[in-house]
């Protein structure tokens, strides 16, 4: 099952007993597929049954993606915490995600954000593209369903955050920037969860086997820097250094480059 909703949908994140309304751009996408096991039905006495039979007993992890425009008020900062922070047991912070439309409320249980992509484009609104996974996707009610959690107050205004990138990379000339990008990725591996005993009791999606635990394989930070070519930076394009000190700041338009920036 796969869903993609436009502006009429609302996204909520419930974390630590608190409920956060997250404003997104045009689309929220989420899906979950089920795995099928096939078995032969051809017998010695009936060789005509070439098509195998199948059973569905387990689900793959749920997937989701959405884009959040960042604002000066920072009401959406919870998504940045969920992207970057780990809890004490070296796991990603998990939360329940709800999407409410004009007719339904969907829930992804024990969701984690596995990737966040930032684009630092001069004088553009700063956004973060988020993708992640969860244990189970289900429809929990209609449009009047009450989402649990203590509602966190929102600012009276939502002011788009227009930024420009400020880059420091050792002693290199990082002026005349066209833009920059940054991607934070966490590679996770879901633990095998199916058992023969549980599979025998599966009758439909409500009691199918769902993933429950995962391990973190690795975390990576990647990106790119784009510059106009000038006499001062023409020799910098093929620097293969792997131990450089890099600082990327998203500075609000109108503030000096020495500002600490909204994001660093």
Short names for language-model regions:
Residues 1-264:
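Signature of extracytoplasmic/envelope-associated structural regions
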